[in-house]
Amino acid sequence: MSKVIGIDLGTTNSCIAIMDGSQPRVVENAEGARTTPSIVAFTDDERLVGQPAKRQAVTNPDNTIFGVKRLIGRRNDDAALAKDKKNLPFAVIDGGNGDAWVEAKGEKYSPSQISAFILGKMKETAESYLGEDVTQAVITVPAYFNDAQRQATKDAGKIAGLEVLRIINEPTAAALAYGLDKEQTQTIAVYDLGGGTFDVTILEIDDGLFEVKSTNGDTFLGGEDFDMRIVNYLADTFKKEHSVDLTQDKMALQRLKEAAEKAKIELSSSSQTEINQPFISMGSNGQPLHMVMKLTRSKLESLVGDLIKASLKPCKDALKDAGLSASDIDEIVLVGGMTRMPKVVEEVTKFFGKEPHKGVNPDEVVAMGAAIQAGVLQGDVKDVVLLDVTPLSLGIETLGGVFTRLIDRNTTIPTKKSQIFSTAEDNQNAVTIRVFQGEREMAADNKILGAFNLENIPPAPRGMPQIEVTFDIDANGIVSVGAMDKGTGKEQKITIQASGGLSDEDIEKMVKDAEENADADKARRELIEAKNQAESLIHSTEKSLEEHSDKVDPTTVEAIELAIAALKDEMESENADKIKSGIQNVTEAAMKLGEAIYNASQEENDDVAEPADGPHDDQDDIVDAEFEDLDNDKRA
């Protein structure tokens, strides 16, 4: 049975881990890094994922997609997306079903598809390390992801060729990695401020039992927002000095974004940094303009202070829902790259009244927790029980547009809940069940997950029919809803899919596209490897020919030269099979040269004759050497 892998699919970076014996192990990617940038780029002839995509972002901003996790499972008209759209160098469009999609090189891609390309890279990383195919995974999501976002993440796994055995919340995964070997009872808070999302989760750990008490968060608060504050500050300052708006230039905007991220990281360990971007724009008279600017840690803290404060309200709400106070928390575990910022650590310390735990790597701990959960599902990890919760209340719209809750937030999952409803009018023969998720009192103010009809209800006075509505949430946090007319036994069930979302046909098409692209990628890699091998062979053969052509007859030299010329022509054909055939021809032709060189070398060795008398044992000329044995204390 192949390994089940654990993947932290992050907004900024992604990470993969496996169980190595009894401990999780992070696997390095092809570039030798332990995390992979969650970036996908499209060029004229290939698709790039990870570090190669990040390297070319400045010169190809329109077709370099990043931060797609903030789009996944969202509608294109989502108010939260509006501020992001104007800051993104690539196009965010309506996917035709109301969902937010992206456009690159004239093609439309769903966020699930882009995420699948990243997951595909993680899958390749695992397969390269393990030396076997990988088909199953545990994937993490922010705890505050709603049903549509969870379903879209699961779709991404399917498109990437992975069976997603479990969707697990990021803070819960971090808690698993933190508490795997802890035997004492502890109440911990996981503060997870990542690249695009924020979560806080309160858990109780007791000798292998991980029970989530409450969770809260903001799926639009993270490092991307911090970066944009710096970008806007730099752009505003530059505009005041030079009357040039850099935000209107996509390449300049991408350079600013990279500079902002670099400055933010540097200011976590130093009090000041310099942002130096030569030739970032042109002045009105055509002269080049350069950006050289100092940014201090205190200035950065003033720019993002409200964002850090915004993370504390979910902390208060999570404690309240758990029925605890800050003093009841035994340990605070920091997760996500943004928790390296000193001001974040300071505010968290002040809020909880104690120093956070520093024994986990905030970039890797979530993937390690996912690997542990994978180990639990595979049977490799024993005596670990995870009890997670649903982050948001679930219910239906009832008379007057009221949101009637069936399952409250922070209910332990998996769970199932039923409630009896009735008709609103006399002789009503059908009811529409509209399913919502959220905390507002009116249904319209919450997130609609889907709707379905229960039909052919026998005529009866209003309030008479008994319609049982049942909500079922699985361990992934994905919702199924059913409705049954108790009088007739008629039943209707659906697994909630985002209104919009990806249909089964969409997913199958994307799976097929991914497989075709995988074949194309493999063919391209074979072509590159064949070309590299051909170039190396041509170089070594020509060098040998130059040095040893006098050792073979002219016919052999001509045959080798013709084979090399043919191989050079085949390298222009972009056909790996032809190049491999040419390599074989050059190798065979060059064998005669190799034999001639070997034979010539043997003849030279044979010409070295022994002295005429032969060997002798005469020791008359041997002189005994004199030596002095030094004491140990005099030796060097």
UniProtKB/Swiss-Prot annotation:
Belongs to the heat shock protein 70 family. PROSITE patterns: HSP70_1 (PS00297), HSP70_2 (PS00329), HSP70_3 (PS01036). NCBIfam families: PRK00290.1, PRK05183.1, prok_dnaK. This is Chaperone protein DnaK. The modification Phosphothreonine is found at T197. It comes from Roseobacter denitrificans (strain ATCC 33942 / OCh 114). Induction: By stress conditions e.g. heat shock. It comes from the Bacteria. InterPro entries: ATPase_NBD, Chaperone_DnaK, Heat_shock_70_CS, HSP70_C_sf, HSP70_peptide-bd_sf, Hsp_70_fam. Keywords: ATP-binding, Chaperone, Nucleotide-binding, Phosphoprotein, Stress response. Residues 533-552, 595-636 are annotated as: Disordered. Residues 618-636 have a biased composition (Acidic residues).
